[in-house]
C-alpha cells in the first residue's frame, strides 16, 4: 500500500513539475514573444492586395470572409455553411442519481432509475475551406478558428433526407438538437441518441480581421494566438487585446495549481 502511495506521489510531482514549467514558459517566453510579433505585424488594410514582401511575416488582415467549401460531417452525412464544426453526441441512459424529485417519480423510475440524456461526447472537428479577400486560409489556420456557437440553422429538407429531425430542448444549454426521425414518433427509451453541433460563427460577406503568417497567397497559423479570426474590422490595438495572448491571470492560476500538485505529491511520498 505504501509503495502504491509513494508511486502516486511521484506521479503527481512529475505532472506538477511539467505543468509548472509549461506555465512559466508561457508567462516569460511565449507571451512576450507573441506580443512582440503582434506589435511588429504588418497591418494589411485590404485583403484584396497581397504584397510579396510580407511573405514569412505575421500579418493582420482585414477583409471580406468567403466560405468556399462548407464543412461536411461524414458520420451523419450533413453539410454546414460553416468553415469548422464539431459534432457532440448524447445517449439516453437510466440513472438513479437523478435531480428529479422522488415525489414526481413513477414506481418504475424509483425502482429502475430515471431516463436522462448523459454527458456529451464530442468528436474531432471537421472543416471546410475559406478565404479572406485574396488570401486562402491554410488547414492549420482553420484548425485554430474558435467554435463559438451551437448550430441552429438546419436545412430541414436535408435533415429529413438524411433521416434526422430537429428537436429543440430548452432545458439544456445547447438547445438545438437533432435526432433520428424514427425516435421522434415514440417515447424515448434507453440508448436513444441525439446530436448537436458547435460551429465557427462566420458567414460569407462578413467583414473580418485575421492574424496569420503570410505564405504566398495563403494565410497560415500564428503560434500562441488565442483568437486568429475575429468579426468586424479591428485596428492593431483591438486585435492585440482580443486575439492576443492568453490572460496572465489564468497562467498564474495554472502555475499555482501545479505547485499544489507538487506539494500533494511530496506529502504522499513522505507521510
Please state what every model-predicted region is.
Residues 1-36, 257, 266-267:
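Hydrophobic secretory-pathway targeting helix
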Residues 6, 38-40, 66-70:
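A short linear-motif detector with a strong N-terminal bias
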Residues 22-25, 30, 45, 65, ...:
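Functionally constrained cores in energy, signaling, and assembly domains
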Residues 27-53:
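Alpha-helical transmembrane signal-anchor/signal-peptide segments
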Residues 27-32, 57, 81-271:
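Charged, low-complexity helical/coil segments in non-catalytic cytosolic or luminal regions
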Residues 40, 78-79:
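Short, charged/polar low-complexity linear motifs in solvent-exposed/disordered segments
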Residues 44-77:
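Short extracytoplasmic
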Amino acid at each position: 500500500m505504501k509503495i502504491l502511495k509513494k508511486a502516486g506521489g511521484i506521479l503527481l510531482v512529475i505532472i506538477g513539475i511539467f505543468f509548472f514549467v509549461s506555465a512559466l514558459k508561457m508567462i516569460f517566453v511565449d507571451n512576450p514573444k507573441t506580443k512582440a510579433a503582434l506589435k511588429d505585424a504588418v497591418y494589411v488594410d485590404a485583403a484584396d492586395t497581397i504584397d510579396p514582401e510580407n511573405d514569412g511575416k505575421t500579418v493582420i488582415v482585414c477583409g471580406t470572409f468567403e466560405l468556399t467549401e462548407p464543412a461536411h460531417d461524414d458520420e451523419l452525412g450533413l453539410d454546414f455553411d460553416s468553415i469548422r464544426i464539431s459534432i457532440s453526441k448524447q445517449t439516453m441512459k437510466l440513472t438513479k442519481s437523478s435531480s428529479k424529485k422522488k415525489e414526481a417519480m413513477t414506481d418504475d423510475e424509483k425502482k429502475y432509475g430515471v431516463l436522462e440524456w448523459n454527458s456529451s461526447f464530442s468528436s474531432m472537428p471537421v472543416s471546410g475551406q475559406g478565404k479572406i479577400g485574396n488570401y486562402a486560409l491554410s488547414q492549420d489556420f482553420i484548425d485554430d478558428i474558435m467554435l463559438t456557437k451551437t448550430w441552429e440553422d438546419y436545412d430541414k429538407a436535408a435533415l429529413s433526407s438524411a433521416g434526422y429531425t430537429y428537436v429543440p430542448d430548452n432545458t439544456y444549454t445547447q438547445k438545438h438538437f437533432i435526432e433520428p426521425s424514427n425516435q421522434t414518433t415514440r417515447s424515448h427509451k434507453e440508448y436513444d441518441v441525439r446530436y448537436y453541433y458547435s460551429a465557427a460563427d462566420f458567414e460569407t460577406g462578413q467583414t473580418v480581421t485575421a492574424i496569420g503568417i503570410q505564405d504566398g497567397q495563403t494565410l497560415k497559423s500564428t503560434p500562441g494566438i488565442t483568437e486568429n479570426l475575429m468579426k468586424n474590422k479591428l485596428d492593431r490595438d483591438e486585435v492585440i487585446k482580443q486575439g492576443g495572448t492568453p490572460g496572465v491571470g489564468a497562467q498564474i492560476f495554472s502555475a499555482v495549481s501545479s505547485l499544489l500538485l507538487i506539494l500533494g505529491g511530496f506529502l504522499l511520498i513522505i507521510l
